[in-house]
Design a protein with these regions (language model features):
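Aromatic-rich, lipid-facing transmembrane alpha helices and their immediate juxtamembrane interface loops
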Residues: 1-170
Length: 170
């Protein structure tokens, strides 16, 4: 259950980050997430991949920046591929950015992931891990069912509508 809580909590922080970034830049407050729950799973997956890096990487900030940014960018690339190929939608495109890979990732946002990796490993996760570990298993199973149901409903809606805007039309 521990890793589920990591995924869930960092997906929620990702949602807050997306909303804050959109507000700060004057962009659209689009949902790049799930239908009902305020979660951005790409952030949860990226955080989990960062946390799975070997311990010796954590002791070397430049290496953590590079490998953490790469690990989270892998999660972002795979999420974009899944959205495009399986669900028939696209939530983001970095087509106009230098060095982009099929519009799914680019060096600028990989660097942002690297900075997030540093904050995650050195500040956020050490403070939150003990709190998340204390959550009782039955609570975890309830949340797991809710997230799975929302993920399924979101995927079905996106596949049927073929438009990410469908998540906003509730």
């Amino acid at each position: 259950m521990e890793w589920f809580w990591y995924f869930l909590f960092y997906s929620f922080l990702g949602f807050l980050l997306e909303v804050g970034y959109a507000w700060w830049t004057g962009g659209d407050l689009d949902r790049k997430c799930l239908l009902l729950l305020p979660l951005c799973p790409v952030y949860g997956a990226g955080a989990c991949l960062i946390l799975l890096l070997p311990g010796w990487v954590d002791a070397r900030p430049p290496l953590l920046f590079l490998l953490g940014g790469g690990a989270a960018s892998l999660a972002e690339y795979l999420a974009a591929w899944y959205h495009e190929k399986v669900l028939g939608v696209s939530f983001w495109s970095y087509e106009g950015r230098p060095g982009n890979l099929r519009g799914r990732v680019c060096p600028l946002y990989s660097a942002a992931w690297g900075l997030l990796a540093l904050g995650l490993v050195y500040a956020v996760h050490p403070a939150l891990a003990p709190l998340l570990a204390a959550i009782p298993a039955p609570v975890g199973w309830t949340f797991l069912c809710a997230v799975a149901l929302d993920g399924l409903l979101s995927a079905l809606l996106l596949r049927r509508a073929g438009d990410p805007a469908a998540l906003r039309r509730r």
